[in-house]
């Protein structure tokens, strides 16, 4: 199921763009992803109410993730590589939902309390 979603030429090409730049700075892919979410995405982590839910399989992994959250923005060449990689793979990137998503409730009411 996941092989069909992610094992695509564009995905591997994107990784070949990202990995050398990440390695040049001594970063891990996980650290790069977390720091991008905190500092370079549209999320408002520091001055807003957005958050990131992480899953871990060990205490060591939790410590590493929390440490990475506290680090600053990524070097510009890493951000540039991520942007370039996204341009390569976005046309074939899978949708988050594997099946069609149908809400069984009024989403506007749930999100905004029915205000106009």
Name each model feature, range by range:
Residues 1-21, 47, 95-116:
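Glycine-rich, positively charged active-site loop/lid region within alpha/beta enzyme cores that binds
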Residues 38, 89, 93, 107-109:
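Intrinsic disorder/low-complexity segments
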């Amino acid at each position: 199921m996941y092989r069909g979603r992610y094992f695509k030429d564009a995905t591997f090409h994107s990784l070949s763009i990202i990995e050398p730049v990440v390695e040049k700075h001594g970063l891990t892919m996980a650290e790069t992803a977390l720091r991008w979410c905190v500092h370079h995405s549209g999320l408002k982590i520091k001055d807003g109410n957005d958050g990131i839910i992480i899953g871990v399989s060990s205490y060591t992994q939790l410590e590493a993730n929390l440490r990475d959250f506290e680090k600053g923005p990524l070097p510009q060449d890493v951000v540039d590589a991520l942007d370039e990689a996204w341009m390569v793979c976005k046309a074939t990137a899978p949708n988050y939902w594997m099946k069609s998503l149908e809400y069984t409730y009024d989403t506007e009411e749930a999100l905004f309390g029915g205000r106009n």
